Amino acid sequence: MTKELEVHTTEIPGLLILDLPVHGDNRGWFKENWQREKMLARGLPDFSPIQNNISFNAARGTTRGIHAEPWDKYVSVASGRIFGAWVDLRKGDSFGRTVTVELGPDTAVYVPRGVGNSFQTLEDNTAYTLSLIHI
């Protein structure tokens, strides 16, 4: 049985963890990485990606340092696994809070602007996807 799409809040306001259904068979797997109607129904903001990037990492242990650009991001993994880490860099009560999660193809994270984003690959040949969002 395939799991349902679930969205989880975190200690960082606006940082959301998504459990994504992955449908597999002997050929491989398929997932809806983003489906607007389903995501909105579960509380994600309505957004329009302005750019989509893929970071391919050949070796396990590759680290990408903390980035905190002035836009929201939607991150996921197309293949492999990562250890993701986020830190709230915004002024206010949540400044300095951190969240860590292992991500594979069945997980995504919505990252609000002002929250630092970083990861380390846990497997060779990991492909990390990043949609930059203008709201």
Cite the ranges covered by each PLM segment.
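Non-catalytic, conserved peripheral segments adjacent to functional cores
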Residues: 1-103, 123-125, 132-133
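Conserved metal-binding segment of the jelly-roll/cupin
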Residues: 102-123
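A short beta-strand-loop-alpha-helix capping motif that often carries His-Thr
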Residues: 116, 128-129
